Amino acid sequence: MMIWRIAAGYMSTKDKLSRFVDIGDVYCPLCRLEIESSLHLFAFCPVTKAMWFNSKWGLRMDSFGFSSVVDFIQFFCSPPFINQLSQKNELLLFGAILCDGIWKLRNQVIFADLPLRCDELNLEYGSNLWNSNFLDSGLFRL
């Protein structure tokens, strides 16, 4: 569902909200360096780029040349560096789970006024999750 919401443009990021309401601060709540858009938040924010790089694939999101969220989502559906279907599915699932975690972290920073704790997100969604072989546990089916 998260991947679909990003691709369809249904994420309530600050760039979208500011078109209708004067929200004041339009900057990314995680890095405070750029205007918050879906593409920035999920792919180019320095905080989230570190999380992608911490994955077992060592993804450097800025090296893929995404120019839109459609490019970003298409990358997960057809990754250029993976041939086996099971590995493609694993990357897609990882992308969806990490995007969900990024969105939850963003909302905690904005609405719960919690400090940014990247280390916790990396532990929860990063390489440790994938080293546990939870895909083989039968809990998730693609």
Where are the predicted features?
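Short flanking/linker segments adjacent to small metal-binding domains or redox-active Cys/His motifs
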Residues: 86-102, 108-112
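Residues that mediate protein self-association or partner binding, especially
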Residues: 31, 35, 102, 106-114, ...
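Short functional micro-motifs and their immediate structural scaffolds
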Residues: 36, 50-53
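Helix/loop segments that flank and initiate small ligand/metal-binding modules
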Residues: 1-35, 101
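Cys/His-coordinated zinc-binding microdomains
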Residues: 32, 46-49
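RNase H-like, metal-dependent ribonuclease domains
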Residues: 79, 116-142
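Short, conserved non-catalytic motifs in the polymerase core
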Residues: 26-35, 73-88, 113
